Amino acid sequence: MVQSCSAYGCKNRYDKDKPISFHKFPLKRPLLCRKWEAAVRRADFKPTKYSSICSDHFTADCFKRECNNKLLKDNAVPTIFAHTEIKKKSGKAVKKEQLPAEPEPVPSVPEVDPAIGLLLPPLYTPSHIAVICDHNYTVEDTVHQRRRIQQLEEQVDKLRKKLKIANQKCRRQERSLEKLEREVSEYREAKGSGYVIFPGNYYEVLNENEYKELAPEITYKEIIL
């Protein structure tokens, strides 16, 4: 189904070669949707999930700048509507299509809520509609999504690099730990054997176990070199 503009007299239809975007009625936001309906000014018009307004009916400040005028800001309301000129088939005078006359404003009477006994806030009419453009609420293309995906992919790459560096550090620490364990083991093995050097003309070097066999009454630690 080809998208077309629901504005009165607008003949814009979706064309990928034209810089015109289409924005669906905010049906999930009743208050804002009623503002759109009032701005369109079409009698007995009820928007559906397929109804949309083209970007020609929104002012420039209603769009997010970084999205090339394809993303509306929050609470944006269409305000640009021109009278449609219809030419007669006979080629005579061109008449302007008259829009339905607006009803006379009815003075609002404050209402009292019987439950709490307080005045209710006044109802706002189309004349009170104000264009408030703050945040995006609709997405007509995938520019924002693609940009977000690209950012996430960059973050994943950075985390992978950090993980690789951390793994390399862990492997180096494991090798250092294994080296220290070998040194400690070798030191303990070497510490189990001792040597005694006798003074004077005795230059024989005896193993501790051999010395104990020769002089069992003297301990190895009592020998003064």
Swiss-Prot record:
Transcription regulation in keyword set: yes
Cysteine pairings via disulfide bonds: none
Keywords of the record, alphabetical order, are: Cell cycle, Coiled coil, DNA-binding, Metal-binding, Nucleus, Transcription, Transcription regulation, Zinc, Zinc-finger
Q: What is this protein called?
A: THAP domain-containing protein 1
Could you list the residue ranges forming a coiled coil in this record? 139-194
Question: Sorted alphabetically, which Pfam families does this protein's record hold?
Answer: THAP (PF05485)
First and last residues of each zinc finger (THAP-type)? 5-57
Q: Does the keyword Zinc apply?
A: yes
Q: Which domain of life is it from?
A: Eukaryota
Cellular component annotations (GO), alphabetically ordered: nucleoplasm
- Which InterPro entries does this one have? THAP1/10, THAP_Znf, THAP_Znf_sf
* Localization, UniProt: Nucleus, Nucleoplasm
Principal cellular location given in the protein's record: nucleus
Q: What does this protein do?
A: DNA-binding transcription regulator that regulates endothelial cell proliferation and G1/S cell-cycle progression. Specifically binds the 5'-[AT]NTNN[GT]GGCA[AGT]-3' core DNA sequence and acts by modulating expression of pRB-E2F cell-cycle target genes.
A GO MF label: sequence-specific DNA binding
Per the record, the similarity remark reads: Belongs to the THAP1 family.
PROSITE patterns (UniProt xref): ZF_THAP (PS50950)
